Amino acid sequence: MLFTECTNSQSQGNVGMGQAIAHYTQKGYTVSIPLNDCQEYDLVVEYPDGLKKVQVKTTKSKAQSGKYVVGLRTMSGYKDKYSYKIGSYDILFVVTELGKTYEYTSKQLEGYKNCITLPD
């Protein structure tokens, strides 16, 4: 399990960020990390068709169906939760505890506010 050694959600998020950076770097994309942590995205990735804001999420949570569920809400530095707003980021990159990754465009997330169930 990918998050076995993680002692809190912040360390789990750090593992997710590392996985995302490795994923995009292996594709040959340039990855930039914003200077601060107050925006609603974690990375800026240079895709062939331009720069994309990428939000990285991790999950160990499963629905009753056994499929992974990932929350879309973002947390501010003061522990405030914000529901997903279209345009907050261009790409959602998800990492499960098994190391499986998923990418969703903002178009694919239309209609969702709090969470999505991953396909498998």
Spans of features found by a protein language model:
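Charged phosphate-binding loop/patch that engages nucleotide di/tri-phosphates or the phosphate backbone
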Residues: 1-3, 101-120
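Acidic-basic catalytic patches of nuclease active cores, encompassing PD-(D/E)XK
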Residues: 1-32
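Conserved catalytic cores of phosphodiester-cleaving nucleases, focusing on short active-site segments
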Residues: 24, 43-45, 50-58
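A generic local structural motif
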Residues: 31, 40, 77-81
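Active-site metal-binding core of divalent-cation-utilizing nuclease and nuclease-like domains
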Residues: 31-38, 47-48
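A structural signal for short, well-ordered beta-strand segments and their strand-loop junctions
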Residues: 33, 53-55, 103
